[in-house]
Regions:
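Aromatic- and charge-enriched surface segment that lines or borders ligand/interaction sites
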Residues: 94-139, 154, 160-162, 303-305
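Alpha-helical secondary-structure segments
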Residues: 48, 122-129, 156-162, 204-205, ...
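Surface-exposed binding/hinge segments that line
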Residues: 108, 143-186, 207-212
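Short, solvent-exposed loop/beta-turn-alpha elements that line the ligand-binding surface or hinge
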Residues: 38-41, 67-100, 177-203, 207-208, ...
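Ligand-site clamp/hinge motif
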Residues: 225-274, 289, 403
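Structural transition elements
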Residues: 206, 333-367, 383-387
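C-terminal motif of bacterial Sec signal peptides marking the signal peptidase cleavage site
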Residues: 17-20
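Detector for C-terminal structural segments
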Residues: 32, 212-216, 292, 316-346, ...
Length: 531
């Protein structure tokens, strides 16, 4: 089992970033790694990226899966981005400034950007995107942008976000899908098909040219992208990226070794040592924001509407065994909540159940007075490692006389059931993580939020989470986040968290210019194939 030292400690809070005026010279290549010293980048070439599951939605407004973002980061630019070290940097927004009361954030935009369809990226486009994300029924970005009262166009390159109150996590939200800009012309013309066929809709380094669900997605070089490398040469270098869903991690690694793929961003722990020793492959790893969980349905009428059952499952888990014996062995860290060691608000002393407590779980179930606990766990199909982890959890729960039946379905099917709050017991679904702890917590525990698939509701948690969003002092904000965590993980649990991941990046040796990011999403704009 890994210690916390394997995780990047990110210093500073977004409140500090928001309070400052940011700007200055754009990092070369958007802050991406250049080829190593002595290795000259070369233009051209095509690669295949083995994605762990098929995408569900390529509209940033409606996307709820990690796999979607792997393609989105190549085709869409966002207003700001993050470096591998966790620093927020200018992207489509060249600089920004926040008012003294924290209620107005003014962004100055790049003027050398066009969408792939040739239409202009400007302040009007930003306003349209943010308002679309905020007001469209079914949008999954509403919580990210809840603090934004209105957006004002000052001029073509200046846009002002008027906030209801100071909002510490705003920049962190704008790094990801809430800050991704899409072409109004394309989205309006395509309509319902935009979810999986947003061709020429972004401004990013690659253009989505083909989308065959379940088989492949083709990204072609954007010759007009604004990014440059450290020497001032145009990016990207690659001509084409083919993204293929490969659900089984072992099969994906075989594809990498046989030349049928050149990039992966997941691996079973048992394979790490061999990959590191393979002279034909490169292995990079950094700490992650991601967490693993079991998601109960706490809606009225379902088994876990009595939260004592959720707590019993959490108590019965042997987290050390899962992280030592399961498929994550060697590449994970035990955890009890969603705030990871990579977050400023992490509390290393938070260990409500340092060891599995099956006897305590039995007593809690007996207190409910309805007999033994039995439920169904929905497990994503296609990956033997995931099923192995679920079987290990099943055996651990049996020690507390808890019966857990396993049912496999595709990840997209499970998420659809989960989002409709129709799962009978629990689902085996985690989260890829966000830079600010608000992105790892708020949407999952606040009443009615878009990712609150457990139907959890606790007024005290709602109040604490609202307070931390408005708090500008990082130390005070941390305490509010930790108070809320104690409630939604222990006192009145919303789901069962059991560990954190790492962010691996595995490539063929002659693919250079890539770095591993804590969100586990590959950045391809500076990737280069050495011939």
């Amino acid at each position: 089992m890994r210690s916390a030292r394997y995780f990047v400690a990110f210093l500073g809070a977004f409140a500090v970033l928001l309070a400052a005026c940011s700007g200055g010279q754009q990092p070369a290549g958007g802050g991406s790694a250049s080829p190593s010293a002595g290795t000259k980048a070369t233009y051209g070439g095509s690669i295949t990226f083995g994605l762990e599951n098929d995408v569900s939605n390529l509209d940033p407004m409606l996307s709820g899966l990690f796999v979607d973002r792997n393609i989105m980061y190549a085709m869409y630019d966002s207003l700001v981005r993050v470096t591998p070290k966790g620093d927020i940097i200018p992207w489509l927004a060249d600089k920004w400034e926040t008012s003294s009361d924290g209620k107005t954030v003014t962004f100055t935009l790049r003027t050398d950007v066009k969408y792939h369809d040739g239409t202009a990226f400007d302040a009007d486009s930003v306003k349209w995107n943010i308002e679309r994300y905020k007001t469209t029924q079914g949008s999954l970005r509403t919580a990210d942008l809840a603090s934004v009262d209105s957006v004002t166009v000052v001029d073509a390159k200046t846009v002002k976000f008027n906030l209801k109150s100071a909002f510490a996590p705003l920049l962190g939200a704008l790094v990801d899908r809430a800050g991704m800009m899409v072409s109004k012309a394309v989205q309006t013309a395509v309509g319902a098909d935009f979810t999986l066929k947003p061709f020429k809709a972004g401004t990013g380094p690659f253009i989505l040219a083909e989308a065959v669900k379940g088989d492949h997605y083709t990204l072609e070089k954007n010759p007009n992208w604004w990014g440059k490398d450290k020497d001032g040469s145009k990016l990207p270098y690659l001509d084409k990226i083919t993204v293929r869903p490969i659900t089984d991690a072992d099969v994906a690694l075989t594809n990498l070794r046989t030349g049928n793929a050149q990039v992966l961003n997941r691996i079973n722990g048992k394979d790490v040592a061999a990959v590191k020793a393979d002279s034909t492959l490169s292995y990079l790893e950094v700490g992650s924001f991601s967490w693993n969980s079991l998601v109960p349905n706490e809606a009225p009428g379902f088994i876990f509407s009595d939260h004592r059952y959720v707590k019993a499952v959490a108590m019965a888990l042997d987290r050390d065994e899962i992280l030592q014996s399961g498929p994550a062995a060697g590449i994970g860290l035990v955890g009890w909540g969603p705030i990871s060691p990579a977050h400023f608000a992490y509390d290393a002393s938070f260990k409500p159940w340092p060891k599995a407590d099956p006897d305590g779980a039995k007593k809690l179930i007996a207190d409910v007075g309805k007999g033994p606990l039995k439920f169904e766990l929905l497990v994503p199909s296609g990956d033997a490692g995931i099923l192995q982890a679920a079987q290990l959890i099943k055996s651990e729960l049996a020690k507390a006389d808890i019966t857990m039946d396993l049912k496999t379905q595709t990840l997209n099917e499970i998420v659809a059931i989960q989002q409709k709050h129709q799962h009978l017991g629990m689902t085996f679904v985690g989260w890829s993580g966000r830079l600010d702890p608000d992105g790892n917590t708020y949407d999952f525990v606040v009443t009615g939020s878009p990712n609150n698939d457990s139907s959890y509701s606790n007024k005290q948690v709602d109040d604490l989470m609202a307070q931390q969003r408005a708090e500008s002092d990082p130390a005070k904000r941390k305490q509010l986040l930790l108070q809320a965590q104690q409630i939604y993980t222990v006192d009145d649990p919303s789901r069962v968290w059991y560990g954190f991941g790492v962010s691996p990046l595995i490539t063929v040796k002659n693919l250079v210019g890539m770095e591993s990011y804590p969100d586990r999403i590959p950045r391809f704009q500076a990737a280069s194939l050495q011939k």
